[in-house]
Curated annotation (Swiss-Prot):
Domain CRIB: 200-213
The name this protein goes by in its record: Actin nucleation-promoting factor WASL
Modified residues (Phosphoserine): S239, S480, S481
Domain WH1: 31-138
Organism of origin: Rattus norvegicus (Rat)
GO annotation, cellular component aspect: actin cap; cell leading edge; cytoplasmic vesicle; cytosol; glutamatergic synapse; Golgi membrane; lamellipodium; nucleus
Length: 501
């Protein structure tokens, strides 16, 4: 029955002659998803025990099932009343099916000798024909697989056997023999032939050309796989599981043979070797140098004068910043006491003014304004010193007003927050850079994509691209419809025996 199904290339369910159409439909529904029965018959199952006596095990409908999910063939017996699987036997390699009687067929099971006693000899005849046809196709396919690896290797082996030393010895021998006697010349040729046979008998890379490390049943031998082939498979994204898979490894092996063999693939791979990757770009540009690197650190506190009285609360201010840099301006040192809280910022004024005078040497008689306030970030450099304005927060010039200044500092609430837009414009390039650092939001962010170069994409042409295309077609066929699967699995069983997913 299976031979009649060759034109459509898809096996259809074949029911039993003794069952009604409704019973056959029920039987087909018990087979399972993507399972097809190639022949069905009503049988009794017998098994031979150790005492060599046949004993009946069960009765039901025997089916020669093509199990596409498991990619194998089984003999299964179903109970159509309860819809249960009663027994099964996989058609292993070298499976032998005997028919001592037309209605009584025997074979070796996994644990004992098994027999099928058919209720109808016509069904028995058709069932036997379906099984023997299947076993014959599998046998022919196995023979072709055994002969395939040895076929294309003969011319390749003769091409690879090249020994420049042999030609050198031949040329050298001819010169010597031209001088010697004719008999000595013949002896020299005989010795030369023995040397040539020894060299030819041990070619360097004949083994790799011979079998490629591939077996029809187990796939590629990963332990003895050629490193260049392994590199090719890695470039194409072929996993070890795919190399061990019987069907996928067969597709890969056929691709290598169609390309010209292992040496042709290796030569093409060397020719298409990608250029070295460009040097990786550096990360983001280094941040600007810290402000203190461009100027000297603040001088230590001097011992002149008495320090101002401490405030009533715990000091929380940061250490005084280094003085700002202005060309042509003498910068005053910071206040002597580091525990002294920062004075309030002075309001900017549009009137030009000279640089601030040096700090007072004593608590009395001082008329100079305080040093410039620090910026909001503690480690940042201070803005240029502001100029006093005519407002209420003008710094007093007398020593009597010094106490009022301290009271304002202690109150804290009257201190004005320094806004970004209220900073005076710096007059030098370095001050402008410091202002940008303090503002922060004006700095350009560096994207993470610039830190590392993207990986070099795999080549999509040549031998690598062709193999990748073959594997993509194979993957699409596995996950596509049954019709697509028939095309890719044609290598497993020819004619109508492709697997279906």
């Amino acid at each position: 029955m299976s031979s009649g199904q060759q034109p459509p290339r898809r096996v259809t369910n074949v029911g039993s002659l003794l069952l009604t159409p409704q019973e056959n439909e029920s039987l087909f529904s018990f087979l399972g998803k993507k399972c097809v029965t190639m022949s069905s018959a009503v049988v009794q199952l017998y098994a031979a025990d150790r005492n060599c006596m046949w004993s009946k095990k069960c009765s039901g409908v025997a089916c020669l099932v093509k199990d596409n999910p498991q990619r194998s063939y089984f003999l299964r017996i179903f109970d159509i009343k309860d819809g249960k699987l009663l027994w099964e036997q996989e058609l292993y390699n070298n499976f032998v099916y005997n028919s001592p009687r037309g209605y009584f067929h025997t074979f070796a099971g996994d644990t004992c000798q098994v027999a099928l006693n058919f209720a109808n000899e016509e069904e028995a005849k058709k069932f036997r024909k379906a099984v023997t046809d299947l076993l014959g196709r599998r046998q022919r396919k196995s023979e072709k697989r055994r002969d395939a690896p040895n076929g294309p290797n003969l011319p390749m082996a003769t091409v690879d056997i090249k020994n420049p030393e042999i030609t050198t010895n031949r040329f050298y021998s001819s010169q010597v023999n031209n001088i010697s006697h004719t008999k000595e010349k013949k002896k020299g040729k005989a010795k030369k032939k023995r040397l040539t046979k020894a060299d030819i008998g041990t070619p360097s890379n004949f083994q790799h050309i011979g079998h490629v490390g591939w077996d029809p049943n187990t796939g590629f031998d990963l332990n003895n796989l050629d490193p260049e082939l392994k590199n090719l498979f890695d470039m194409c994204g072929i996993s070890e599981a795919q190399l061990k898979d019987r069907e996928t490894s067969k597709v890969i092996y056929d691709f290598i043979e169609k390309t010209g063999g292992v040496e042709a693939v290796k030569n093409e791979l060397r020719r298409q070797a990608p250029p070295p990757p460009p040097p990786s770009r550096g990360g983001p540009p280094p941040p600007p140098p810290p402000p203190h690197s461009s100027g000297p650190p603040p001088p230590p506190a001097r011992g002149r004068g008495a320090p101002p009285p401490p405030p009533s609360r715990a000091p929380t201010a940061a250490p005084p910043p280094p003085p700002p840099s202005r060309p042509g301006v003498v910068v005053p040192p910071p206040p002597p006491n580091r525990m002294y809280p920062p004075p309030p910022p002075a309001l900017p004024s549009s009137a030009p003014s000279g640089p601030p005078p040096p700090p007072p040497l004593s608590m009395a008689g001082s008329t100079a304004p305080p040093p410039p306030p620090p910026p909001p970030p503690p480690p940042g450099p201070p803005p240029p010193p502001g100029l006093p304005s005519d407002g209420d927060h003008q710094v007093p010039a007398s020593s009597g007003n010094k106490a009022a200044l301290l009271d304002q500092i202690r109150e804290g609430a009257q201190l004005k927050k320094v806004e970004q837009n209220s900073r005076p414009v710096s007059c030098s390039g370095r001050d402008a850079l410091l202002d940008q650092i303090r503002q922060g939001i004006q700095l350009k962010s560096v994207s993470d994509g610039q830190e590392s170069t993207p990986p070099t994409p795999a080549p999509t042409s040549g031998i690598v691209g062709a193999l990748m295309e073959v594997m993509q077609k194979r993957s699409k066929a596995i996950h596509s419809s049954d019709e697509d699967e028939d095309d890719d699995d044609e290598e497993d069983f020819q004619d109508d025996d492709e697997w279906e997913d």
